[in-house]
């Protein structure tokens, strides 16, 4: 069989940053392989793995084992694991899963063709840099796997924060920004292909530019992206509160294309726990930032994440999170039970909170947030929102998102329309009903 006739399927797990890596790998493979969506049709299967928390690790291993079945039941000849789990546990994966023919770490995304070639030849190919240094640019081939109307733009790679519970700096390397010119050229190309919304992502988006330019460049980057014709929404994800400057607030406020939405992961609401997590700043400072954001941008939607059951977390410290959630009333809040990640400082502590209590606290917080989110959503009933149409349903109904909804992690807007709507178009929708996560409405004629 000629290489050009071989079919490759890429299975992506984890976060949008992983998705971008899969898109770059797919772009490189397009010249030599047919890309297929169904693994059962593929001669080569690539699993781009995640290892952020224990459940993600388990999902990645399960997926590798599931895909390995196609070596017996399907036509798969070569099975390769890439991404964070492969970077962290490459040797162990090769030893424990004999069906694996290759391993590739996070720093070798652009070397996927060489990896496949070696994996097909030798059946034991390990490429996993100790300290990943790779960062893609706009010249690399990339096949977007997201719907045509939006795209993720990775402005930086790696992380220098070293939160005590997190393994990411070890599997993604030091923080490194792309050049502003590279990002702008990529967004211009996306706009020419019909992309309406760009989501700026990194492990720490607010840090963008500091390593490369000696200053935080996110405000100027946003202003330049806003000048690109065709881009209508700019969404900020993964923003650290201590680096969110007054300049950045002003740019958000004065740039209509910036979504009135902010993903601001806080992780906890008690200063002692924050310090033990190696999170910079205090909860009072975070509260001050939130107050300022809501004062300057009254219609902003705020998303955060919290960790329950961090080592040593007392009931009193957990209640600080509960009271903070009640006081701040986030529009979106995701809670995760602490995951004990080996090789992290937090995992070495002897005062681990029992798993049952971690989960109980997580469930309690999410139950509270469900009620808060429902109440927060009611303010949109009767208002007219700009909605990006993304899916057609039967009976003249469509699914879209407002600027308050990031794709895949937030809610949607269900839209009734007497006329046909086009996927990727913006329409004005009068909101008639709201639940905790989704909105319902009718197209404004």
Curated annotation (Swiss-Prot):
EC code(s) of this entry: 2.8.4.4
TM stretches of this protein: none
A molecular-function term among this protein's GO annotations: protein methylthiotransferase activity
Lineage, opening ranks: Bacteria, Bacillati, Bacillota, Clostridia, Eubacteriales
UniProt keywords, alphabetically: 4Fe-4S, Cytoplasm, Iron, Iron-sulfur, Metal-binding, S-adenosyl-L-methionine, Transferase
NCBIfam families given in the database record: 30S ribosomal protein S12 methylthiotransferase RimO (TIGR01125), MiaB/RimO family radical SAM methylthiotransferase (TIGR00089)
An annotated GO BP: tRNA modification
Function: Catalyzes the methylthiolation of an aspartic acid residue of ribosomal protein uS12.
Cofactor comment text: Binds 2 [4Fe-4S] clusters. One cluster is coordinated with 3 cysteines and an exchangeable S-adenosyl-L-methionine.
Source species: Desulfitobacterium hafniense (strain Y51)
GO CC annotations, alphabetized: cytosol
Binding positions for [4Fe-4S] cluster 1 per the UniProt entry: 15, 50, 84
UniProt-recorded name of the protein: Ribosomal protein uS12 methylthiotransferase RimO
Compartment(s) of residence: Cytoplasm
Reactions catalysed: L-aspartate(89)-[ribosomal protein uS12]-hydrogen + (sulfur carrier)-SH + AH2 + 2 S-adenosyl-L-methionine = 3-methylsulfanyl-L-aspartate(89)-[ribosomal protein uS12]-hydrogen + (sulfur carrier)-H + 5'-deoxyadenosine + L-methionine + A + S-adenosyl-L-homocysteine + 2 H(+)
Residues bound to [4Fe-4S] cluster 2: 159, 163, 166
Gene name in the database record: rimO
Cofactor(s) demanded: [4Fe-4S] cluster
